[in-house]
Swiss-Prot record:
E.C. number(s) listed in UniProt: 2.7.7.56
Protein name as annotated: Ribonuclease PH
UniProt key word Signal: no
Record-linked Gene3D superfamilies: GHMP Kinase, N-terminal domain
Catalytic reaction annotation: tRNA(n+1) + phosphate = tRNA(n) + a ribonucleoside 5'-diphosphate
Organism of origin: Escherichia coli O1:K1 / APEC
Length: 238
């Protein structure tokens, strides 16, 4: 029996609260069960030096965890003087995922920074960050259109992510912390709304997994992501 009695293919309750803060062009509080992440999208005119004069935009991301988002306090990375490898890996993943959602040529020479701050962690913080940041990004892009900075919205479609894994020999979707810490296999999957794969991060933490198990996990992820995308679209429609 999974925590909260979920079936193996069931994601946790997903909530997306838009316009959560007042200053950012897009802001979303995303909740996957007890995992809560604040995602903001900030627009700047201009692009990094390596893109200057090419007529296209850029999307980047930063990720961080509040000191007491976890069971025991973790010192802020700013206090340590440097970002950890996990943080850098996750923020690059978020940026890659969200660039797949946008026509960067149509964006023009704007940079959008997605800041994902974990308020409470109970597994799946990177997948929640991608899911919430995509909605914040959609709001920010719509503001560029409404303000006359862009003629058409460069958003190609929604992007969402979910964790899948093998726990006690069973393939399950959207792992919370107690499952994640005991998983034999742990995988994060990012997809477009039509089911195309952007990224797969998978590791056999305990027992190696088979090709058949990989296909099972990807199918589980696709079903979970379809449900999450429906929640994203419902949030944007309100």
């Amino acid at each position: 029996m999974r925590p909260a009695g979920r079936s193996n293919n069931q994601v946790r309750p997903v909530t997306l609260t838009r316009n959560y803060t007042k200053h950012a062009e897009g802001s979303v509080l995303v909740e996957f069960g007890d995992t809560k992440v604040l995602c903001t999208a900030s627009i700047e005119e201009g692009v990094p030096r390596f893109l200057k004069g090419q007529g296209q935009g850029w999307i980047t991301a930063e990720y961080g965890m509040l000191p007491r988002s976890t069971h025991t306090r973790n010192a802020r990375e700013a206090a340590k003087g440097k970002q950890g490898g996990r943080t850098m890996e996750i923020q690059r993943l978020i940026a890659r995922a969200l660039r797949a959602a946008v026509d960067l040529k149509a964006l023009g020479e704007f940079t959008i920074t997605l800041d994902c701050d974990v308020l409470q962690a109970d597994g799946g913080t990177r997948t929640a960050s991608i899911t919430g940041a995509c909605v914040a990004l959609a709001d920010a892009l719509q503001k560029l259109v409404e303000n006359g900075k862009l003629k058409t919205n460069p958003m190609k479609g929604m992007v969402a992510a979910v964790s899948v894994g093998i726990v006690n020999g069973e393939a399950v979707c959207d792992l919370e912390y107690v499952e994640d810490s005991a998983a034999e296999t742990d995988m994060n999957v990012v997809m477009t709304e039509d089911g195309r794969i952007i990224e797969v991060q998978g590791t056999a933490e305990g027992e190696p997994f088979t090709h058949e198990e990989l296909l099972t996990l990807l199918a589980l992820a696709r079903g979970g992501i379809e449900s999450i995308v429906a929640t994203q679209k419902a949030a944007l429609a309100n």
